[in-house]
Amino acid sequence: MGIRRYKPTTPGRRGASVADFVEITRDHPEKSLVRPLHSKGGRNVHGRITTRHQGGGHKRAYRIIDFRRDKDGVPAKVAHIEYDPNRTARIALLHYADGEKRYIIAPVKLKQGDQVSSGVGADIKPGNALPLRNIPTGTVVHAIELRPGGGAKIARSAGASVQLVAKDGPYAQLRMPSGEIRNVDVRCRATVGEVGNAEQSNINWGKAGRMRWKGRRPTVRGVAMNPVDHPHGGGEGKTSGGRHPVNPKGRPEGRTRANHKSSDALIVRRRKQNRRR
């Protein structure tokens, strides 16, 4: 993937950029792997806003992605590399030898015509999926399961990758993009390689309208609102809110307590924190 920069023909185009899409080989999805996707606009079943800053945007269709990679022993050919509006990564359409078609996340160096497979006997090459116990230490992987058979949960976005640093009994140690080292069951599957489209993070969107096309509405600070709209609103002149940060409902915002997750016991080394001095 490369980035194409616009000429400054308008203020919105000045400095803006877009992906060049040179890796895309087809402009329409596989019909059998598409489902309708209805926009909720951040509302719940009662019509109340539960997630702010969502709404509008271009209509999308959801592409069904194979995150389990459980079709063992059946080789597949990469028929197309396609654009997916629902994620930052590109997706690859696989045609299996038995006639089935599936989508997977497209890793770096995977191209049209390549052969991929999954299972214990698969080769260590980009796009192949294996249990962690069968992947050599030091290999870069993505689309990793947290529970055996549960489907990929980690490292699925553009440019994401995780390194397998060690194996110790029933666990494999993975170094996350954040620097955290975590134990994962060696029976969990992972796909070899790094997720493609890594330059996605370098795109300059240029104008607010392009964010609206993506379904993102403006983010307004509470201190810029009136008292009727937010607990931080109002006051004479500019104020800092006058209290600890809260959400529009008045509940404390930010890091208010320590996390107590059952999976915390699997963390070997936590990521480096940016501590205030």
UniProtKB/Swiss-Prot annotation:
Protein's organism: Frankia alni (strain DSM 45986 / CECT 9034 / ACN14a)
InterPro entries: NA-bd_OB-fold (IPR012340), Rib_uL2_dom2 (IPR014722), Ribosomal_uL2 (IPR002171), Ribosomal_uL2_bac/org-type (IPR005880), Ribosomal_uL2_C (IPR022669), Ribosomal_uL2_CS (IPR022671), Ribosomal_uL2_dom3 (IPR014726), Ribosomal_uL2_RNA-bd_dom (IPR022666)
Role noted for this protein: One of the primary rRNA binding proteins. Required for association of the 30S and 50S subunits to form the 70S ribosome, for tRNA binding and peptide bond formation. It has been suggested to have peptidyltransferase activity; this is somewhat controversial. Makes several contacts with the 16S rRNA in the 70S ribosome.
Start-end of Basic residues biased regions: 268-277
TM region positions: none
Any one biological process term the GO annotation gives: cytoplasmic translation
Family membership noted in the UniProt record: Belongs to the universal ribosomal protein uL2 family.
Region entry Disordered, spans: 37-57, 222-277
Assembly, per entry: Part of the 50S ribosomal subunit. Forms a bridge to the 30S subunit in the 70S ribosome.
Listed name of the protein: Large ribosomal subunit protein uL2
GO cellular component terms attached to this protein's record: large ribosomal subunit
Record's keyword annotation contains Ion transport: no
Entry-linked PROSITE patterns: RIBOSOMAL_L2
Keywords: Ribonucleoprotein, Ribosomal protein, RNA-binding, rRNA-binding
GO molecular function, one term: transferase activity
SUPFAM superfamilies for this protein: Nucleic acid-binding proteins (SSF50249), Translation proteins SH3-like domain (SSF50104)
